[in-house]
Structures are given as structure tokens and as C-alpha cells.
A protein has these predicted regions:
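N-terminal nicking endonuclease/strand-transfer module with a His-rich metal-binding environment
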Residues: 1-177
């Protein structure tokens, strides 16, 4: 999902029909931060630098989060949902379901390190539905923008930077191997 994930569903502020409230205690909350607070953390300094350079008041940005929400180029956040198998082969109440939960937990524990430009603000492992699955909500950003804010929301730049890191790693392996 892009910008339409349900953080309230993920954090179980309400229960969907397909969840079992008696098993919600088995869910894991890795983080659950307010998205606006995370936007301030990521972008306030860049926003101040950008606004200081502007000579026209109509070019200044008052609230970067609201600008992204009302714009059409970027989404305020993205959500990925990861699941291994299905309810028939990895049901949450089975040993295989517990294995799936362990794998998803390990994946999440290292997600931020592997993806430094995807700022995770909400992440939950659900064990109260038919199959264990992981919700990760994140804000993609770049710190190397030459136009506009130098630090800004950009999923495209994240993928480009990831490709560059992979290519550099492959080059190191070829030259050292």
C-alpha cells in the first residue's frame, strides 16, 4: 500500500473481523510513532534551510507533512506487508506458523539497518489472524537532493541509492574475489 495503510488497525486500536482479540496478546509491536513527529525529526532542519533561502514568501513551506499529503508526486508513507505461506501451510496456531513468526521477527530486527533511508515509524507482527504477517510502515527519504529541500521524501531516490550500494558491493566482490 502507498499512503493508505491503517496504522490504527496495525496497532490494534480496533479489531477487524478476521482477527481474534483473545490472541492479540501474541502480537509484537516493534514501534508505533506518530508520523507527524517523525516528519519533524526527519525534515525540520532541511525545511528551515529551504525557507531561509527563499526570497518570496509564497515559495516557503509551512508544514512539510501537509505539503506531501496534499501533493501528487509523493505519498506521506508506504506500507509493506510480509507473510510466509498461507493459513493452510503456515497457520498462526501451528509449529510452522511459529517458524514463520520467528523468520518475520528476524527480518524486522534488521530492516532499518538494511534500509537506512526508509524511516520505519510503525511495525507490527500480527499473530491474531489466520497467518502470521508483518506490517512495516515507513517514510522513504533522501539526503542528497539538489533542488528543493536537501532532505526530502523520495521513494525513487531510495531505490536508486540501493541500486548504487548493490553495484558497489558487487564491484568490491569482483575485485577482491
Amino acid at each position: 500500500m502507498t499512503g493508505k495503510g491503517s496504522v490504527n488497525h496495525n496497532s490494534r486500536k480496533f479489531h477487524a473481523k478476521n482477527s481474534d482479540p483473545e490472541r492479540s496478546c501474541l502480537n509484537v509491536e516493534y514501534c508505533n510513532e506518530n508520523i507527524k513527529d517523525v516528519y519533524h525529526e526527519l525534515f525540520d532542519e532541511a525545511l528551515a534551510r529551504y525557507n531561509d533561502k527563499q526570497t518570496r514568501n509564497d515559495r516557503k513551506i509551512d508544514d512539510y507533512y501537509e505539503k506531501i499529503c496534499s501533493g501528487k508526486q509523493e505519498k506521506p508513507f508506504h506500507e509493506i506487508i510480509l507473510q510466509i505461506g498461507n493459513k493452510d501451510d503456515m497457520g498462526a496456531k501451528t509449529a510452522d506458523g511459529q517458524l514463520a513468526a520467528k523468520i518475520l521477527d528476524e527480518y524486522m530486527q534488521d530492516f532499518q539497518r538494511r534500509n537506512p533511508t526508509l524511516r520505519v515509524f510503525s511495525a507490527h507482527l500480527h499473530m491474531d489472524e489466520a497467518t502470521p504477517h508483518l506490517h512495516i510502515d515507513f517514510i522513504p527519504y533522501t539526503t542528497a537532493s539538489k533542488r528543493g529541500l536537501d532532505t526530502r521524501v523520495s521513494l525513487k531516490r531510495h531505490w536508486r541509492d540501493l541500486d548504487l550500494r548493490a553495484a558497489q558491493g558487487a564491484k568490491r566482490n569482483v575485485t577482491s574475489g
